[in-house]
Amino acid sequence: MNFVEELRWRGMIHDIMPGTEEHLNKGMTSAYVGIDPTADSLHIGHLVGVMMLRHFQRAGHRPIALIGGATGMIGDPSMKSAERVLLDEATLRHNQDCIKQQLAKFLDFDSDAPNAAKLVNNYDWMKDYSFLGFIRDIGKHITVNYMMAKDSVKKRLSAESSTGLSFTEFSYQLLQGYDYLYLYRNEGCRLQMGGSDQWGNITTGTELIRRKDGGEAFALTCPLITKADGGKFGKTESGNIWLDPARTSPYAFYQFWLNVSDADAEKYIKIFTGLNQDEIAELASRQAEAPHLRPLQKRLAEEITVMVHSREAYDAAVEASEILFGKSTTEQLRKLDEATLLDVFAGVPQYHVERSRIATGISLVDLLADATDIFPSKGELRKTVKAGGVSLNKEKVADAEQTVGEDDLLSDRYLLAQKGKKSYYLIIVE
């Protein structure tokens, strides 16, 4: 199966320029995907392009990841409604270094093979290009009529857009077009890939290559990822799902994939994993027979968490999930780092207690029915303890008068109270 066929069955092709597949079938070629460096981490919205490069390399071709250091200083108007904040060079360089470390989990940069991946930054070839030189060498080959016909430009100039379009952003497609020309000349790059909103910018590049060098280059875009319910992919109430564990914990990352709908799971497992058709068909069959067991979601969450983080991080995320949703022990609870603990219990009621009350030792009855109002009265607490319905840090409480001290704290500042099987309360000691 060739690269285009691989993407096609995975549902990863939106538009493809005629002749692309035939060109790729002639032998190894190079293709690039542009990556916005405005943060020091990729988020899962970037993963479609990254997976395209991964499949490209696996098919024997050479992937190039282009960090948009220069274009990131400007901003792409495609499908955006407002001008972006511009970043300085030092921040962009830092972001590039962080992004390369993440890309190395998907692409082989270190191989001696001729199709080893390469990372480039368009700031390196744009920084010394004068404005006069650029508009003379590049601008004269692309007409304003051609640029105005792009959907991204039309949308920003329409009556429904109140922000208009700055000249800076209008010039973006020329810069992206020049990137393609530069890589065509210097890296033998014949294909640019991206999201479907990038088609206009990519074809500006193929047109520039044709007019400047009389060359032939190709374009391929993937669909913008959507959710079955029409919601925006990759966003939660707390924002983006990042690949950096400091921004999104491996537990929260795992939970995101585990909780996608059945319809989305079957689509996403094709896009975001390397599982083959037979493996996915078998999982889909099991899902149809027993949807409550969620085999698609579980395998999707496993594959992508291991790929982005590690097998150990995945195992820890599964174990953390069991703390909230299944049987677990105090030992498992104590193994959680602070960030994961807070993610696991993000939705439970929280109470704050002064450290002085814990430092000297406080009885459980005073903690849960006085220092907090987890129980409305001490009598109610004693009654529930007697019935075996109270736990502290996942241990059943046998004595309502037991003393709680600093040795009981999780991560030196938390206590987890539980009433019955499902009601949790996080006590924060300050």
Curated annotation (Swiss-Prot):
<dbReference type="InterPro" id="IPR002305">
    <property type="entry name" value="aa-tRNA-synth_Ic"/>
</dbReference>
<dbReference type="GO" id="GO:0003723">
    <property type="term" value="F:RNA binding"/>
</dbReference>
<feature type="binding site">
    <location>
        <position position="176"/>
    </location>
    <ligand>
        <name>L-tyrosine</name>
    </ligand>
</feature>
<keyword id="KW-0963">Cytoplasm</keyword>
<dbReference type="InterPro" id="IPR024088">
    <property type="entry name" value="Tyr-tRNA-ligase_bac-type"/>
</dbReference>
<dbReference type="InterPro" id="IPR014729">
    <property type="entry name" value="Rossmann-like_a/b/a_fold"/>
</dbReference>
<dbReference type="InterPro" id="IPR054608">
    <property type="entry name" value="SYY-like_C"/>
</dbReference>
<dbReference type="Pfam" id="PF22421">
    <property type="entry name" value="SYY_C-terminal"/>
</dbReference>
<dbReference type="InterPro" id="IPR002307">
    <property type="entry name" value="Tyr-tRNA-ligase"/>
</dbReference>
<dbReference type="GO" id="GO:0006437">
    <property type="term" value="P:tyrosyl-tRNA aminoacylation"/>
</dbReference>
<keyword id="KW-0648">Protein biosynthesis</keyword>
<keyword id="KW-0030">Aminoacyl-tRNA synthetase</keyword>
<keyword id="KW-0067">ATP-binding</keyword>
<feature type="binding site">
    <location>
        <position position="172"/>
    </location>
    <ligand>
        <name>L-tyrosine</name>
    </ligand>
</feature>
<dbReference type="GO" id="GO:0004831">
    <property type="term" value="F:tyrosine-tRNA ligase activity"/>
</dbReference>
<dbReference type="GO" id="GO:0005524">
    <property type="term" value="F:ATP binding"/>
</dbReference>
<comment type="subunit">
    <text>Homodimer.</text>
</comment>
<comment type="function">
    <text>Catalyzes the attachment of tyrosine to tRNA(Tyr) in a two-step reaction: tyrosine is first activated by ATP to form Tyr-AMP and then transferred to the acceptor end of tRNA(Tyr).</text>
</comment>
<dbReference type="InterPro" id="IPR024107">
    <property type="entry name" value="Tyr-tRNA-ligase_bac_1"/>
</dbReference>
<dbReference type="GO" id="GO:0005829">
    <property type="term" value="C:cytosol"/>
</dbReference>
<feature type="domain" description="S4 RNA-binding">
    <location>
        <begin position="362"/>
        <end position="430"/>
    </location>
</feature>
<dbReference type="InterPro" id="IPR036986">
    <property type="entry name" value="S4_RNA-bd_sf"/>
</dbReference>
<comment type="similarity">
    <text>Belongs to the class-I aminoacyl-tRNA synthetase family. TyrS type 1 subfamily.</text>
</comment>
<protein>
    <recommendedName>
        <fullName>Tyrosine--tRNA ligase</fullName>
        <ecNumber>6.1.1.1</ecNumber>
    </recommendedName>
</protein>
<feature type="short sequence motif" description="'HIGH' region">
    <location>
        <begin position="37"/>
        <end position="46"/>
    </location>
</feature>
<feature type="binding site">
    <location>
        <position position="235"/>
    </location>
    <ligand>
        <name>ATP</name>
    </ligand>
</feature>
<dbReference type="Pfam" id="PF00579">
    <property type="entry name" value="tRNA-synt_1b"/>
</dbReference>
<feature type="short sequence motif" description="'KMSKS' region">
    <location>
        <begin position="232"/>
        <end position="236"/>
    </location>
</feature>
<keyword id="KW-0694">RNA-binding</keyword>
<keyword id="KW-0436">Ligase</keyword>
<dbReference type="InterPro" id="IPR001412">
    <property type="entry name" value="aa-tRNA-synth_I_CS"/>
</dbReference>
<keyword id="KW-0547">Nucleotide-binding</keyword>
<feature type="binding site">
    <location>
        <position position="32"/>
    </location>
    <ligand>
        <name>L-tyrosine</name>
    </ligand>
</feature>
